[in-house]
Amino acid sequence: MSRVAKAPVVIPAGVEVKLNGQVISIKGKNGELTRTIHEAVDVQHADNQLSFAPREGHANGWALAGTTRALLNGMVIGVTDGFTKKLQLVGVGYRAAVKGNVVNLSLGFSHPIDHQLPAGITAECPSQTEIVLKGADKQIIGQVAADLRAYRRPEPYKGKGVRYADEVVRTKEAKKK
């Protein structure tokens, strides 16, 4: 039995929730997010709270209810406060710039990299070696950050590459003669 699913999600003021069958839509100051809920989960909306319970006949109903609760809680946080992800560029000549919804990266290749940002995601560069991604959808923020990191992952000898701001890169010792 899921302990996560037993805790209700509190809906703050200024957030509008629409439940239409198995499709839930949450709207706030940062936009609107929509998700389809698994048929094994029953969601009730009352008193500015979302409560979750499994439906009969599904073996993994409590597990899916806990997962659904965590996803919808992330949606509520996203439309109220939003999510941020910070990336750092470590290496000589590694630079980033943002023009509109395109991130321009110079990562030591013979060509610059232009990465198109999806709708709902904004990026800014406080310095040439930092990228800050902002948006309401936690999953898309993480995917964009992973895509940018995949262009030049941190290598284990000098640590050069694109890394998350909170990432610790374990460096290896160079080969001895």
From Swiss-Prot:
Gene Ontology, cellular component aspect: cytosolic large ribosomal subunit
Alphabetically ordered keywords of this record: Ribonucleoprotein, Ribosomal protein, RNA-binding, rRNA-binding
Superkingdom of origin organism: Bacteria
GO MF entries: rRNA binding; structural constituent of ribosome
Keyword check for Cytoplasm: no
GO annotation, biological process: cytoplasmic translation
Entry-linked InterPro entries: Ribosomal_uL6-like, Ribosomal_uL6-like_a/b-dom_sf, Ribosomal_uL6_a/b-dom, Ribosomal_uL6_bac-type, Ribosomal_uL6_CS
Gene3D superfamilies linked to this entry: Ribosomal protein L6, alpha-beta domain
SUBUNIT field: Part of the 50S ribosomal subunit.
Function noted in UniProt: This protein binds to the 23S rRNA, and is important in its secondary structure. It is located near the subunit interface in the base of the L7/L12 stalk, and near the tRNA binding site of the peptidyltransferase center.
Family of this protein: Belongs to the universal ribosomal protein uL6 family.
PANTHER family the record matches: 60S/50S RIBOSOMAL PROTEIN L6/L9, LARGE RIBOSOMAL SUBUNIT PROTEIN UL6M
Protein name (database record): Large ribosomal subunit protein uL6
Species per Swiss-Prot/TrEMBL record: Sodalis glossinidius (strain morsitans)
